[in-house]
C-alpha cells in the first residue's frame, strides 16, 4: 500500500508519454518528420503567440508547459512541443481579405496544424544539411489526421534561425511578450 502513490505516478507517466510519442518512438527508435502523434490537448498549453499575420493567413501558436519554462537565451528542453494553428484569412463576397477594426486580418476556418517536438537524439535522422537540433516536424488536418507535406521545406525555413533561437521563429518576440527578455 505504501508504494501505491508511486505506482500511480509511474502509470500516469506511461500513459502521458504514449499519447505524445508514436509507436516507433515508444519502441526506442527515433521518430522522423511526419511521425509525431497529434497532441489533442494542445489548446490547454500556454499561448506562445496569437494572431500572427501572414499575407493570407492568421496563425496561433501554443507551447507545452515543459517548453514554457524556458527563459530567454536558453534552448527549449527535451519534451518541448510547439503547435501552430494556421487559419485561412476571412474573405468578403468580392474575394478581398477582411480586416478587423485593428487593421488585422480576420480568422476564418482552421486550415492545418503543424507540430514541432523536441527530444534527445530525435534530430539524428534529419539530413545533415537540414538539422534543426533535435526538433521533429509533423503536419495535420484540422481533424487530427496526418497531412502530407514537404518536411524539407519546414526544416529549410527554420534552419537560418540556428542554435541561438533554437530554430524557433519569433523566439525573441515570444520572450518580449512574456516579459522575460533581457
Which residues are covered by each model-predicted region?
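Bacterial N-terminal signal peptides
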Residues: 8-18
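Sec/Tat signal peptide C-region and signal peptidase I cleavage site
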Residues: 20-26
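Bacterial N-terminal signal peptides that target proteins for export
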Residues: 1-9
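Short, structured beta-strand/loop micro-motifs enriched in basic residues and often containing a Trp
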Residues: 55-67
